[in-house]
Amino acid sequence: MRVIAVNGSPRKKWNTATLLKNVLEGAESQGAETELIHLYDLNFKGCKSCFSCKTKGSRSYGKCAVKDDLTPILERIEDVDAVILGSPIYLGTVTGEMRSLMERLIFPYLTYTNPIQSLFPKKIHSAFIYTMNIAEEQIEEYGYATLFNTTENYLRLIFGEAESLFGYDTYQFRDYSKVLADRFDEKKKAKRRKEVFPEDCQKAFDMGARFAKNE
């Protein structure tokens, strides 16, 4: 059993990365081999619209033809039993690096046939972990539900199984006194990080363990 987690946050030790690490720890508890990839360490770009992945007879049919730091990551994902993507929400969507990964990861496997099919070689577990500043009850107000549902639907279409995990109302700064952010109540944020974030981490751990047991 092999599990890969991909961190789309520029921060390697904060909310998104912490939840992803808990997923991998859960998988490791069941004997899985794991890997955590930090996208911001890589030099890559999104889809170049070359359509080599869609061209009849192309050596790259069903695969991204672009060669850069992301190429070996995409190749390794083909061999895993579970893939978990994670990103904070920036301006109402995932980070630019995560979006670029998703273009290169999902689009080549997506056929332009009727009906649409997946060229991914097998069915695996997949999930997306989101972290964000807003509270759960604000999801509809900010229009995030559409993003979450669309992403989960694409993951399910390509990989066969998909789910989402959310970290709401996260503690954003190490020291709120140094940042002009008076719309946030630092004490409430700190209380939630102490009381609720550990529950989110447990959910992530349980997800990883469940994936590793192939449940």
Positions of the model-derived regions?
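N-terminal beta1-alpha1-beta2 submodule of the flavodoxin-like/Rossmannoid cofactor-binding fold
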Residues: M1-N114, R183-E215
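Cofactor-binding loop segments of dinucleotide-utilizing enzymes, especially the Rossmann-like FAD-
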Residues: G8, L39, I129-T131, G167
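Short aromatic-enriched loop/helix-cap "lid" or pocket-rim segments at secondary-structure transitions
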Residues: C47-C50, I139-E141, R174-V179
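Membrane-targeting and insertion segments and their boundary/processing signals
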Residues: T71-E75, I129, R174-K178
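Short, catalytically relevant binding-site loops at active-site mouths
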Residues: Y90-G92, I134-A135, Y171
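Short, glycine-/small-residue-rich phosphate/pyrophosphate-handling segment
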Residues: G96, Y109-S164
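The feature marks non-catalytic terminal segments
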Residues: I158, S177-E186
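Beta-strand-loop-alpha "switch" segments that mediate conformational coupling across diverse proteins
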Residues: E163-R174
